[in-house]
Amino acid sequence: HDAFKVNAKQIFDSYYNKGLFDKKVTETIFKPLLEAKNLNLNITLKEFYEFSNIDLHIFTFELNNFQTIEMSHTTHPELQLLQVLTMSSSLPGIFVPIIIDNCCYIDGGVLCNYPLNQCLRDHTNKNEILGIKSSYNKETDKFANVEVTSESSLLEYIICLSINSMNYIRDTIKMETIENTVKCYVLENPLTLGSIKESIQNQELRRQLIQMGEDDALEFLATIVKL
């Protein structure tokens, strides 16, 4: 909740900063998790791998060259973990993009929201992979578009353009499938400005979302038991 406070200055500055929230949001969210393991906020991908022995791959989208960038301890060892996490989640209009060496990094979901194909490239045994996938429509298993109305703000218009473009691009990419997939369904698109505001301000809604995720996981586990 403390990470997403919005004031008038932020709204005015977002015109030049290209977003409402900067990397401080990521630091606020992950600080207690890292400190619980006695890890520094400035920990690099290489250092995090040495600590965890987890081959973590994070995907971001570089806007100027219009390409997906895969980041790990082998490709970008000296980049800070929190910086890379910020790059991968910078939804246009909401989060300030990370700009390094004339490259503009935004949410990796533009072309790679669910990097299953990349995972199978490195690990071909589908039985060893567990996917966790979100979807807004249980019947079509697709993401819902966001609508612009006469009451929509400029920020909501930008978010709508971003999300709907991402949805269209994702639908054109051929995706592999695996049996071991936890499908998490939500009632509405959680990336609209209204949904983000409500989830930040409404503690009960956050509990409901967590419970929905738990229910989806239990439903998946029940199918495993039957097998």
State what each model feature region is.
Residues 1-227:
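Patatin-like phospholipase
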